[in-house]
């Protein structure tokens, strides 16, 4: 989901030399990935009042303004830094909207329906059966529906790490860095989340992933 790091490093070097075009190119290259990340996590109640594209624009504007600080002190890979800005923006937005509405939004943030259907189907297929009957299209739709429901029913930490691994396609080491965990701890959290997801989906069927 996130752009390759080699060209990103070249653009960061150019941005560090004061090239404004490089900063703009960095933002453009990462815009779609930020949009997907925001769509995955934007609460439906908030999404009814706030356009996701506005959130993305705010995140990229903040990143542009703070680019000098990042280039001088890159505490983490650029895409992880950018997604952290987006995550902080979403947390603040949900907090402000809860206060404005004077009501509680579910502590377990529900997924927006705009996340990648293909990624969800791929993971659902891994967790369930690998062989489809002749009514493949119907089964795939059923898998998607069941997977979306199961993912929504997970605890926030479990859902987050599955999104990071299967929607954002982050490696275990990237997840560990983003969550400030050791790599073994990140791996164990991911396996725990998969177990819980399989329990919801029904892990007693054949063809599930081993743990």
Please state what every model-predicted region is.
Residues 2, 6, 14-39:
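A short, charge-rich alpha-helical start-of-domain segment used by transcription regulators
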Residues 13-17, 40-47, 58-78, 96-98:
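Sigma70-family region 2
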Residues 27-50, 65-69, 151, 200-203:
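Amphipathic, Lys/Arg- and hydrophobic-enriched alpha-helical face
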Residues 31-35, 53-64, 75-99, 103-108, ...:
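Σ70-family region 2.3-2.4 aromatic/basic alpha-helix that recognizes the −10 promoter
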Residues 34, 113-160, 170:
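Amphipathic alpha-helical segment used for protein-protein interaction
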Residues 46-53, 77, 94-126, 208-209:
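Short, basic/polar amphipathic helix motif occurring as a linker/hinge flanking DNA-binding modules
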Residues 47, 112-114, 178, 194-211:
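C-terminal edge and immediately downstream basic/flexible tail or linker adjoining helix-turn-helix-like DNA-binding
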Residues 147, 158, 164-167, 172-203:
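DNA-recognition helix of helix-turn-helix
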């Amino acid at each position: 989901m996130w752009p390759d790091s080699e060209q990103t490093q070249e653009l960061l070097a150019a941005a560090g030399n004061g090239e404004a075009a490089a900063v703009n190119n960095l933002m453009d290259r990462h815009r779609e990935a930020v949009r997907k990340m925001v769509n995955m996590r934007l609460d439906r109640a908030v999404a009814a009042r706030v356009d996701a594209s506005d959130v993305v624009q705010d995140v990229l504007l903040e990143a542009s303004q703070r680019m000098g600080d990042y280039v001088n002190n890159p505490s983490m890979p650029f895409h992880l830094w950018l997604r952290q800005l987006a995550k902080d923006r979403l947390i603040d937005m949900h907090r402000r909207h809860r206060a404005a509405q004077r009501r509680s939004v579910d502590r377990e943030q529900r997924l927006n329906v705009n996340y990648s259907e293909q990624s969800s189907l791929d993971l659902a297929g891994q967790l369930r059966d690998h062989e489809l009957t002749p009514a493949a299209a119907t089964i795939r739709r059923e898998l998607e529906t069941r997977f979306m429901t199961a993912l929504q029913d997970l605890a926030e930490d479990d859902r987050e790490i599955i999104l990071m691994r299967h929607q954002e396609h982050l490696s275990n080491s990237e997840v560990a860095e983003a969550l400030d965990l050791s790599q073994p701890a990140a791996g164990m959290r991911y396996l725990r989340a998969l177990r819980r997801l399989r329990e919801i989906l029904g892990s007693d069927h054949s063809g599930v992933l081993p743990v």
